[in-house]
Curated annotation (Swiss-Prot):
Pfam families reported in the protein's UniProt record: DHHC (PF01529)
Membrane topology per record: Multi-pass membrane protein
EC nos: 2.3.1.225, 2.3.1.-
Keywords noted in UniProt: Acyltransferase, Golgi apparatus, Lipoprotein, Membrane, Palmitate, Transferase, Transmembrane, Transmembrane helix
Gene: zdhhc7
Catalysed transformations (reactions): L-cysteinyl-[protein] + hexadecanoyl-CoA = S-hexadecanoyl-L-cysteinyl-[protein] + CoA; L-cysteinyl-[protein] + tetradecanoyl-CoA = S-tetradecanoyl-L-cysteinyl-[protein] + CoA; L-cysteinyl-[protein] + octadecanoyl-CoA = S-octadecanoyl-L-cysteinyl-[protein] + CoA
GO biological process: peptidyl-L-cysteine S-palmitoylation; protein localization to plasma membrane; protein targeting to membrane; regulation of G protein-coupled receptor signaling pathway; regulation of protein localization to cell-cell junction; regulation of protein localization to plasma membrane
Subcellular localization, as worded in the UniProt entry: Golgi apparatus membrane
The keyword Transport belongs to this UniProt entry's keyword annotation: no
Residue span(s) of domain DHHC: 122-171
Protein name (record): Palmitoyltransferase ZDHHC7
Assembly description: Homooligomers.
Amino acid sequence: MQSSGQRLRDVEQHQPLLSGGEEEVTAGRVWFIQDSCGMVCAFMTWSLVMYAEFVVNFVMLLPSKNFWYTLINGVAFNFLAVLALTSHLRTMLTDPGAVPKGNATKEYMESLQLKPGEVIYKCPKCCSIKPERAHHCSICKRCIRKMDHHCPWVNNCVGENNQRFFVLFTMYIASISLHALCLSGFHFFTCVKVQWNECSDFSPPVAVMLLIFLCLEALLFLTFTAVMFGTQIHSICNDETEIERLKNEKPTWERRVRWDGMKAVFGGPPSLLWFNPFAGLRLRMLMVRARRSGAEFSV
């Protein structure tokens, strides 16, 4: 009798059959989850980043009389904000690794011509042949390869295909949050010395309220995203998703060593491309494919 690990590996042996044309079509589609909570959280994420942009640029930097201080911090903060929002979009609109839906038909499973003792697993919820390390997401209503968790803030699952962008998103949000806190602290210190005279185009009470809210927002985002970033790096280096860790599943796969895991997620050896959320983005090709095959929505 085969062990559980052997039976699970049998699924991987049939992967060329399980991930045929349907998955290639899905990869060319625009992926978007129509979940009310997720869409609200994604909108809030963008709104809060835009608020930080407004306060940093129009309350702190532009009123400053120090040209180089304004230029250097303005370029750095806005550049990191663009990278953060791009990473958010890539995480949200990238297929996380959805298994083809409804392919576990009796006729199709018979066509696989399994050998005696070979076992494949079927997800009863989405009627899909379930590969090793795939889990069903009740929100996406799909089985996701190497599903780590479903994050409402990006309105998507974090899985095999978009984990890299999620890591970049948490890293860049943590970076702009820390930068905003430092700028706010320096601005408070400077304005108190001059008693807020000529410190801002806004009245002192309004400026103080805007800065306090920014500090609270930045502190909350910094704490949350820094923890998530550390958790994701730990999961990648240990080749274990958050679901597998919580379920305390015994590995039935050969774990990658730390750098192999990082290279598998970020693609290739260490380079600056690891930090580039635009890498691999072919907008023109994506638009052509979207017109040809339509968008894939999960309701």
